[in-house]
């Protein structure tokens, strides 16, 4: 505990300088909220002194916006008279690799939105990985996964990752630019070529999530589609919510929730979508997240297995 307090004190001292030098553009007439990370938890309490920014009306959810423009929807609850950031906070922590001794700077920018800056214990700012160029276009990608997380993904059952049985010409999924697929997904050369052309034709502003239909997603009880942690942490930053799937002018409400492995799954509503669109084993669904500030909406493109 003494070590933690010393680390926090050092970070606080550094921030006094940073507030004067590096945060000059961040400061307006709004009050900043400075919060040290002294222990890791699935929630974060907002200091009472900061709550007056909300005008006495505490919203049920707020958006946390990072310097790189990514936003995270976080549910707000009351616990023992304190206002707490709860559902969705864990995704924010994971995506930014927060550690004990890090320091958060929150600025209320109106409309239930907080702009955030993150500093490590040395006072250096931590920023989400910036967009990188993939086949001539820029995409926001998730923070790098730790080596431990990579090992866990390798140990997962292939059948739960939406894979097609490997063949002699199997190709790794990450070779498809602009498309995130579950780890260890193997594609035939024909599937890869079709997928590349389809992703280019969609021309999405954000990475597309692809999933190959397997027994769990067609005949499973429950019938599910798993969304990889790499994609879900950044683009579906909530623990339990509804995603609207659109295909050929129709829409389906599908429940999306967190799993024990910290990935996410489509559950209630997915079986109806799969049945209505006559999905079969080996079909590939491409989920294109649309920009909608009020809800999560995805256009679904289907590549039939021939």
From Swiss-Prot:
Sorted UniProt keywords: DNA-binding, Nucleus, Repeat, Transcription, Transcription regulation
SUPFAM superfamilies for this protein: DNA-binding pseudobarrel domain (SSF101936)
Domain of life: Eukaryota
A single GO molecular function term of this UniProt record: DNA binding
Gene3D superfamilies (alphabetical): DNA-binding pseudobarrel domain
SMART domains in alphabetical order: B3
One Pfam family this sequence matches: B3
Location(s) in or outside the cell: Nucleus
Chief site of localization: nucleus
Record's protein name: Putative B3 domain-containing protein Os03g0621600
Source organism of this protein record: Oryza sativa subsp. japonica
Lineage, uppermost ranks: Eukaryota, Viridiplantae, Streptophyta, Embryophyta, Tracheophyta
């Amino acid at each position: 505990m003494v070590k933690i307090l010393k680390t926090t004190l050092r970070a606080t001292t550094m921030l006094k300088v940073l507030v004067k030098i590096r945060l000059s553009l961040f400061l307006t007439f709004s009050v900043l909220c400075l919060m040290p990370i002294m222990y890791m938890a699935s929630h974060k309490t907002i200091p009472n002194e900061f709550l007056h920014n909300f005008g006495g009306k505490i919203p049920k959810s707020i958006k946390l916006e990072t310097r790189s423009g990514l936003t995270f929807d976080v549910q707000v609850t009351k616990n023992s008279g304190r206002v707490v950031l709860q559902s969705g906070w864990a995704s924010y922590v994971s995506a930014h690799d927060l550690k004990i001794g890090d320091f958060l700077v929150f600025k209320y920018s109106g409309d239930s939105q907080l702009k955030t800056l993150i500093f490590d214990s040395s006072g250096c700012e931590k920023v989400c990985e910036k967009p990188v160029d993939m086949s001539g276009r820029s995409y926001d990608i998730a923070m790098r996964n730790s080596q431990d997380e990579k090992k866990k993904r390798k140990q997962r059952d292939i059948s739960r990752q939406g894979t097609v049985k490997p063949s002699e010409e199997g190709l790794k999924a990450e070779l498809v630019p602009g498309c995130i697929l579950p780890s260890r997904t193997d594609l035939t050369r024909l599937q890869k070529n079709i997928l590349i052309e389809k992703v280019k034709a969609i021309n999405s502003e954000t990475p597309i999530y692809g999933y190959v239909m397997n027994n769990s997603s067609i005949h499973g009880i429950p019938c599910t589609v798993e969304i990889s942690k790499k994609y879900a942490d950044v683009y579906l930053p909530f623990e339990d919510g509804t995603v609207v799937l659109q295909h050929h002018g129709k829409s389906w409400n599908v429940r999306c929730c967190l799993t024990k492995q910290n990935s996410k799954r489509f559950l209630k509503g997915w079986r109806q979508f799969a049945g209505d669109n006559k999905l079969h084993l080996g079909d590939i669904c491409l989920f294109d997240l649309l920009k909608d500030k009020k809800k999560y909406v995805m256009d679904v493109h289907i590549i039939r297995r021939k």
